[in-house]
Amino acid sequence: KKVTDMNSMFSNCYSLSNLDVSNFHTTKVVDMSYMFSSCIKLSNINLSSFNTSKVKTMHGMFFNCKSLKSLNLSNFDTSKVIDMNYMFLKCGNLDNLDFRKATFNKETKHIAIFSKVPSNITIITKNEKTKNWLKDKIKSDNITIA
């Protein structure tokens, strides 16, 4: 049986600084809420093999990950995600985010998705529509189309 719920899996792992979850099988996962929330020392994470095509909620997924400076989510398919509220809230040192496969629609909840993230963050995205959506949420001009 495959895992479908990873809610709070590593939440509050205060001493965790490096994490390689590249061997995780996530093809059936629908909930990644708070998965890494408050991992305040987490500075390096490998999510390169994550299949997020069925995920519906990423609510607070990286909430309060204060030590993350760069995050590669280039393989994240967010087409089915309906809740991204607080996803990067309080990631105060995040200065580089590769979010090139991310899509957003009217139904996607996104309250405070980038609240307390540096305004000079560099975000890589896939098209002009997504760039404009992100620009409106983060109030940054450092959004690049890949």
For the regions a language model picked out, list residue spans one by one.
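Negatively charged
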Residues: K1-A146
